[in-house]
Amino acid sequence: MQYGVILNYFYNAWIHSTFFSILQKIWEPFRRAYDNLAAVKLLRRGNRIQTLYESSLLSRILRFVLDIICRLFSAIAGFAAPAWKGSLIVRLCRGSFILNFEFLLGAFICAMFIMPHSYWNNGYAIVAAIGFLTLYLILVGSGKRKLMYPDKLGFPFMLFAIALVLSLLFSQNRSDSMRILLFFAAAFIFTYVIAADMRDAKQLFKLLAFIYAAVMVTAVYAIIQRKFNLVYANASLTDLKINSGIPGRVTSTLDNPNNYAEFLVLFMPLCAAFAGTRKNQLSCVALLIGLVFPAVALIMTYSRSGWISLMLAALIYVWLRNKKLIPLFIALALLAIPFLPSTIVTRLTTIVTSFLGSSGHIDSSAQYRFQLWESVGYMIRDYGVNGIGLGPASFASLSPLYDTVDGAVHTQSQYFELILETGILGFVSFMWLILRCIKDSVIARRRADGLVRALLIACTAAFVGIAFSCIVEYLWFYPRVLFAYFILLGITFAAIFMANPEAKATL
């Protein structure tokens, strides 16, 4: 991040203060204990399984198929080259800022999230994913890109994909499960295409600029919703009895305030990395100030899980950027509490009252989850090994047998949903995938600098932050959040490969 003169002054004053020295002495025993934890030592070990996976039969088959496709495109390109070499389309695309792969990919991702819910169709993402994959392979075949084999995304990624496909065998409603599997396939393609195509910080800059634009546009629209009273207090979204005075919760272009909060938690750290690494100090400050808009929008969602997730993401971001600023971060967070509007304080206190019952009334959303999870526990007991298949239809076919809460369409927890839908294999492979991704990002940041380093920190922060929301929300029920999650994963892989180029090298 670009620190100005004033910020540098306060920073130096802080790290040389007596109070900071005392905090360092208090922290040192905890740091030593952390370094000696068995789990930490395990995460720091090398990845032997990946080496075995890359030489496996499955990996060789996938490479063979991709090589055949690329050779086919290469032959077609060679045959047609004389005809289109001087064509108008080629002349327009050559050197164009707009008519190139990165611009089109970023523009679609931006459009995906700024399009209002009533106009969006998940089929757009499926068609776009297939189109971008085809275009990428054409570029590889014509020699414009270097092919990245899917095994570079890691064995856990492939294992999770296999678990999703195998879940079809045990599905309670195969047609609906197939529909959801198509959404996952599109999400995986976005991950692969982003990881494969992004080769340098300049390309990442383009993509992040579009993501920043999407976050800003949706934030401004959310503020407009509140300003012009386009949203109203809804008893189905908020317990109005203990949340008195809470206004309507903004949804922006998404369908639900929690969905929008999850989108912001996933992408705001990326926006912070994008803004904070601008070389021009004026643009850096302007872009950082712009983050006030999505922060305000997140507050207006009144999503308690979203608030906690973003605070956790911010804590991780500061931790990985500069641990010495952690006490200052905590102090500023505590000092901000007295200045919070009463409606926000009311909403935050319901977190405590929901679990302790100190107000004599448990929040209806918390009560709903507790009752639902009790029934889900029995469903997992009976179907947790193989799963019941993807999609709400499979859940709906079994839920009446377990006396679940009326109107429940999913488990209200990402982790419960993964076990129930995909079984143990799906849950373990997903957790392995994300933990490995976080581990690789933290390690890779030590070798990176500039935008790539900031981005690795931001991706780690986003994944850790959203992990809290996964406890009390099923993020992927709304497909655009599913796409956002795996777009973030693709950006993470791309940044890891840039920090460690040999990890992306083809065999």
Residue ranges of each PLM-predicted region?
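Transmembrane signal-anchor hairpin modules in multi-pass inner-membrane enzymes, especially those
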Residues: 1-166, 172-176, 202-205, 209, ...
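Alpha-helical transmembrane segments of multi-pass inner-membrane proteins
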Residues: 108-109, 162-166, 189, 205-246, ...
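Hydrophobic core segments of transmembrane alpha-helices in multi-pass, intramembrane catalytic enzymes
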Residues: 124-134, 179-191, 258-274, 305-317, ...
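Transmembrane alpha-helices of multi-pass inner-membrane enzymes
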Residues: 130-135, 436, 451, 459-507
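Structural signal for the C-terminal ends of transmembrane alpha-helices
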Residues: 134-146, 193-202, 272-279, 315-323, ...
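Aromatic-anchored transmembrane helix interface
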Residues: 152-160, 174-196, 205-215, 262
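A membrane-periplasm/extracellular boundary helix in multi-pass inner-membrane enzymes
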Residues: 220, 226-229, 318-360, 364, ...
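Long extracytoplasmic/lumenal interhelical loops at the membrane interface
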Residues: 232, 246, 359-374, 378, ...
